[in-house]
């Protein structure tokens, strides 16, 4: 047991004794706050926040009361209890304590005027020689304000007034720790400014606090004047007060512009945060250094720890690696004094060591921090999150990618919070609170829109530099309802369609970003390094050039990877590892090693405190969309959040925006349609001849679904369309649009009869519907037990398909294979078709698209990674989303595989909402691959489906229709909806 642990345990024992002792045996009744408060504060100082919270609750229970009301001596324990919740990540509960404390101050506005202040020279603080690890920026003395001041009031005789205040007779003398009351009030005001952000100005407390602090105390003591300036300044940061808040805080850092005092550290911390937000890192660093030094002298360890964390962030963001040594000295000094300070210094020094590429030192420092945080008594989730983030950065810098991903996930887990604590990230908390206040009419629509727009905005350069982990947690958190509400507010305001399209696109892109561990940062770096420098925005080009100058191996590695890919593509397909040349194997091993190292380096860059715009996928622009559309094209896009659905239809010369009114009926209609065509069997399934009859039940349901989804204006736009480019969202990815009726009138033909249909992931990726036809030199088919139950028939069907495709190679999973590596096979193939079941759940990145050889290389999520070379044409008729089991999820099991393919180089893909299999799939797939040789993908799928309708199949050969009822006909026509309406053509090229 360390000395620090022994000290903390002794404090906890003392706290317990005080809690059970008689009031007469505790601190004298006139001394406030009670002794329990100071014991709890010591526990907080050493990082035992959970035990400290218990202590502050005990102090609250023993605090003075006036009738049923608390007095001002409850302010410190309330605020410090809030600090315990804040450190645990429970922003909501922390805010409750801060507000309760400030309400007490508002309820007792005259208490500060009852303080008996002696106008005398303040004693200088005895210098602590060992607190010299940083240079103080100003040559001022440091003075001690008496902690306990007399109040000419007896709170035991006080009575509440009708107005809610407190009236106390001047009889006895009470000793109150005024400096602690004021110091903790400054903490509460700062936290409200940070936690509430733009909401602070709309708080019911904002105006009363402004009024209270606008009235200066009657006392004229210089230290009290300085303290009041700090409180008023910090309060004004989160209000509409017409004052220079920063100047007030700056003036309050010194007593009469001469001496530092107990509130100087807190004021300097606030000034540093303001400068950091402005990007003035040199000034911020000076303020944080001074705050840490002074806080250490006053033994305000929480301020020391927070100042060091902020200092380290600014140092890393601005390249101040010279602060590495002082941070190490601070860590040594803090040993046996404060776990929170020591951990903050170690983590900050560790990150600076990583930027200096001294990974050995960084590893040593972070291991020391980990030992400190592993103690059972220490509970610092924010520090644990910071440690995991910094350890992840170290692992990526050392090319230990698996460890990096593990620690990153741990860091995000801490930062996202839990169902118990709620959101840890302020912007997420502000978003949810804004939605709640708007729903309860406590916030105007205009104010809510402004706040949501700020909270949901693309992270700024300053955000990435100061709080990269919090930004990543924010970007990887589902926020669909907030984006939908922002869209609704913009619609109510009468925003132009271009703005609405951009908001819809952001919601669609967010669905991709939230599923990626780095929130799209890796995609941004891959895009930046793979593209031409001239294609980047000037600010992004500057960042990339600086990174390449700092890490020149990046450019060389990228060029070498490209060379190796070209070399392997020119060689034979790696079908049999035993027949590969030594040179080919050597080239692939080098590529594999270099790619893994390159990905680690990209992750290292992505986690660093440097901004790079997330331009992949591109942001949407209505003029750009309309400019690309061909005559006869209609774009239809949706966004969905909860029970709210919005759609937009776009033609070259026309747009229409609408809200889907009856979403509950929409869900019921979709579920009914899937049941009526026989995909989901609840009770007796329809007979095949019933499902293909003109009066089949599903036809009426499809008409109802179409009428729910599309207003008359959109039906009119569709009537003259030749191709529909669909961009669904959420569970609308499961809708088989191809089988919806052509017109709003009953009995009309399905969409697929009248027009081609294609899909792209987001509005901003519309160019994926206008690609160029790729040159196909190698086609590869991978076939499992998919076309027939008996292997000979299945293999024969696969061979027929392969023979109809030029330059085709066939791999049968029923045979023993010696494929070297799925990744190698993927990069060497131009056209890939996989006739095998491919399970795709909510974690769709794990869908095993290449079920060969090394299992870890089979997942489609790896298609994003280096070497990012994917087959130009992909067919996955066996993709198996959760819809097959009757589960209507969030659509990620379709959306994410599409993103993986199209954003990694694939030009088009044919996938399925449900796997059909059997002989009908053999006929469809063969026709689809043949049509692709001469036609665009959307037209190829349409022609293949219509050709399928003319066929007759043995019911026994169609597993999706089995088991069948005894009265079923042995033959089933190819126009049975289950056999064709699940296929989707994703991505397209110009006509």
PLM region spans:
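Catalytic cores of nucleophile-dependent amide-cleaving enzymes
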Residues: 758-766, 827-927
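Single-residue signature of alpha-solenoid repeat helices
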Residues: 52, 94, 205, 245, ...
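Boundary/activation segment at the start of structured domains
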Residues: 652-653, 729-790, 963, 972-991
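A domain-level signal for caspase-like cysteine endopeptidase catalytic cores
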Residues: 682-689, 694, 710, 730-732, ...
